[in-house]
């Protein structure tokens, strides 16, 4: 489930990403810069994700937000200046289908351990 579907509400009025469904697709990103007060720059921009359905959501963090991106970088609002260089974050892509098409492999992780690699065999195909 991507961030776009996560914003949908179920019959009980709860967001799907906090109720019945769990996220399984993430983009692992690293903090590259904290030079500007209140902001951090990560290495996940448009070349690793599709934002046609909205920007990604930072998994498990309500205190920071992904607010902008360029081709190769993302800007994270960090009002409390908590993030440090090389900190790792998991992004929930705004739209999973075209995000997957930008990658060659799924890296399958269970309990913090890589357990498999799945090729994205249709990557870049337009038929």
Task: Report residues per predicted region.
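Active-site anion/phosphate-binding pocket segments in diverse small-molecule metabolic enzymes
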Residues: 1-127
């Amino acid at each position: 489930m991507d961030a776009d579907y996560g914003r949908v509400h179920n019959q009980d009025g709860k967001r799907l990403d906090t109720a019945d469904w769990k996220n399984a697709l993430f983009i692992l990103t690293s903090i590259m810069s904290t030079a500007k007060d209140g902001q951090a720059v990560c290495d996940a921009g448009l070349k690793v994700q599709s934002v046609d359905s909205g920007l990604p959501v930072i998994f498990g963090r309500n205190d920071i937000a992904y607010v902008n991106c360029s081709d190769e970088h993302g800007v994270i609002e960090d009002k409390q200046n908590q993030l440090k260089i090389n900190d790792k974050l998991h992004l929930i892509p705004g739209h999973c289908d075209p995000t997957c098409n930008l990658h060659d492999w799924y890296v399958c992780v269970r309990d913090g351990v890589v357990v498999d690699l799945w090729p994205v065999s249709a990557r870049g195909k337009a038929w």
